[in-house]
């Protein structure tokens, strides 16, 4: 099978979407490009176009693409492929052959758009929905008008001043003769009264604080009074309570030294540890010795 017959059979057996997409420049360029070596061989042999396959019987055959033939030209739908092969110059064949392999460059795009425009103008029923026809430009003025139609007109909206004037008579106080004359007639006065009642308890502690400050000032002038009301700044090191201290003092009066069993018993009664009871008795004995030494010195003097 020759190269020309191979490309021609591929062009006829392509699927419908591929055929529809490459009809304007693809198949035409392929058929023209494939015809170039055949024509050169004929010129070398000096023979006529007897070896060129004749596809004239296929030109009138309607394919599944709404009666559009793959071998017809866009300008002359009924013309055959053989005259087109003889009449096309060599440089134009090369140009279409390159545009077939590079479909996204300028020449292929121009031929495609020209085909769409001509087919849409001449035969509107053959225009396909999958063709890349340019979308119509959107009229911005029309869109804006439609958008404005969706929005209610500004003139129908009431102004804030009108709303205030309409609401004001409803909130006006009732006449004094009406039975509704109560605290609700003047809400501002009621709110002020309640705020004043809430602020009164806050003012009383402030007055007490002022009195305490005056007392401290008078106490500072009198040292005897200030000594009585003075608070010790020394941190307590002893964790014993008054009840625990009193019970330990009683136990110390009975016996200055405790046995281990008695120490554990006192610690359990007073909720203390054995070490705490032991330390307290040691400190208490040291204190008693100091007091005895002072008494002796006072007697000797």
Curated annotation (Swiss-Prot):
Instruction: Extract the InterPro entries matched here.
Output: Abd-B_homeobox_TF, HD, HD_metazoa, Homeobox_CS, Homeodomain-like_sf, HXA9/HXB9/HXC9
Q: Where is the composition biased (Low complexity)?
A: 69-92, 173-182
Kindly give the SMART domains that the UniProt entry links to this protein. Answer: HOX (SM00389)
**What is a single molecular function from GO for this protein?**
RNA polymerase II cis-regulatory region sequence-specific DNA binding
What keywords are annotated for this sequence in UniProt?
Developmental protein, DNA-binding, Homeobox, Nucleus, Transcription, Transcription regulation
Record field: compositional bias (Basic and acidic residues): 183-216
Compositionally biased region (Polar residues): 57-67
Gene Ontology CC terms: nucleus
Q: Which residues form each disulfide bond in the chain? A: none
Assigned protein family = Belongs to the Abd-B homeobox family.
Could you tell me the Gene Ontology terms of the biological process aspect for this record? anterior/posterior pattern specification; embryonic skeletal system morphogenesis; proximal/distal pattern formation
Q: Where in the cell is it found?
A: Nucleus
- The answer to whether the entry has keyword DNA-binding is yes
Question: What this chain does, per the record?
Answer: Sequence-specific transcription factor which is part of a developmental regulatory system that provides cells with specific positional identities on the anterior-posterior axis.
Acyltransferase is among the record's keywords: no
Designated name of the protein: Homeobox protein Hox-D9b
Name the source organism.
Takifugu rubripes
Q: Where is this region: Disordered?
A: 33-120, 150-226
Residue spans binding DNA: 233-292
Compositional bias per record (Basic residues), positions renumbered to this chain: 93-103
């Amino acid at each position: 099978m020759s190269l020309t017959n191979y490309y021609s059979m591929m062009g006829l057996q392509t699927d419908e979407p591929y055929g529809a997409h490459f009809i304007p420049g693809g198949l035409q360029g392929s058929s023209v490009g494939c015809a170039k070596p055949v024509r050169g061989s004929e010129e070398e042999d000096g023979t006529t176009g007897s070896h060129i396959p004749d596809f004239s019987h296929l030109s009138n055959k309607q394919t599944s693409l709404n009666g559009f033939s793959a071998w017809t030209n866009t300008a002359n739908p009924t013309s055959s492929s053989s005259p087109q092969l003889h009449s096309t110059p060599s440089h134009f064949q090369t140009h279409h052959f390159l545009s077939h392999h590079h479909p996204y460059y300028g020449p292929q795009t121009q031929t495609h758009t020209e085909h769409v425009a001509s087919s849409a103008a001449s035969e509107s029923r053959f225009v396909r929905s999958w063709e890349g026809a340019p979308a119509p430009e959107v009229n911005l003025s029309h869109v804006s008008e439609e958008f404005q139609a969706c929005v209610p007109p500004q003139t129908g909206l009431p102004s804030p001043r009108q709303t205030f004037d309409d609401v004001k008579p409803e909130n006006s106080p009732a006449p004094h003769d009406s039975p509704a004359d109560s605290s609700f007639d003047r809400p501002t006065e009621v709110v002020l009264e309640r705020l004043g009642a809430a602020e009164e308890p806050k003012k009383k502690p402030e007055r007490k604080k002022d009195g305490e400050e005056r007392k401290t000032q008078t106490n500072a002038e009198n040292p005897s009074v200030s000594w009585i009301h003075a608070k010790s700044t020394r941190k307590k090191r002893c964790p014993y309570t008054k009840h625990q201290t009193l019970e330990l003092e009683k136990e110390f009066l009975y016996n200055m030294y405790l046995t281990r069993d008695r120490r554990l018993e006192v610690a359990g009664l007073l909720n203390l540890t054995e070490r705490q009871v032991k330390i307290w008795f040691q400190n208490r004995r040291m204190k008693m010795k100091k007091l005895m030494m002072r008494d002796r010195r006072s007697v000797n003097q």
